[in-house]
Amino acid sequence: MHTSATPSHTNTPSSNLPESSASNTETAPTLGRFISFEGTEGVGKTTAIEQLCLRLEANGIPYLRTREPGGSPFAEQLRDILLDPATDIEDDTELLLLFAARCDHMQQVILPALQNGTWVICDRFTDSTIAYQGFGRAYGDELVRGKIDMLIKQFVTQLPELTLWLDLPVAEGMKRANKRSAADRFEQQATEFFTWVHTGFSQLASEYPERIQRIDASGSTDDVSARIWQTVMDRFDIK
């Protein structure tokens, strides 16, 4: 099965496709682990993922760093559409485009990597869809949540074993996010939208306390990185 991941020990921020530290010379004997990162805008996911990947590499653990929406060539094309501020689509269309991207990403990238013994580190996954589309767009509407859950059950064959929810007050996250470059289609939403998104993540953490671990995203990047690494070590028994 084709995968767009290119084995490498060096993360290239400008690349739109997954970055992998997996070796071409040896296949791991066991299935890889699947970790997702979640959170509202400006919580520091990108830096936290970079730090985790450095720790995995230092421990000789092969990993593939990827993202959603995106992660495969086709999914990246859909990402461009979804994040373009000029895109004007209905909520249902947005939801279906997200799952189209996710299906391709999973089949072309995530599953092959896991089957090869590579750890997959994904910037956003299904929880973001529930939080952003189910709560940010639909204010927690049960019918919309049911629709999303149905799509997950139908098309998502592998959920993360561990989800790291980086939690920060919405106002603080938005203050950080506003210092970045031009906002994309989601980042341009109002504070109320992200307050609902935060509510969604909080509810998901209550629903799935074993899988979703809340990480305090305040403080220095070193502090946050240490909290994340301790959680990963405890979950996967890394010495």
Where are these regions (language model features)?
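NTP-dependent small-molecule kinase module
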Residues: H2-A28, Q51-C53, A171-K239
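Pre-Walker A (Motif I) flank of P-loop NTPase domains
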Residues: T30-F34
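Hydrophobic anchor at the beta1->P-loop junction of P-loop NTPases
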Residues: F37
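A glycine- and Lys/Arg-enriched "phosphate-lid" helix/loop adjacent to the NTP-binding pocket
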Residues: D127-T199
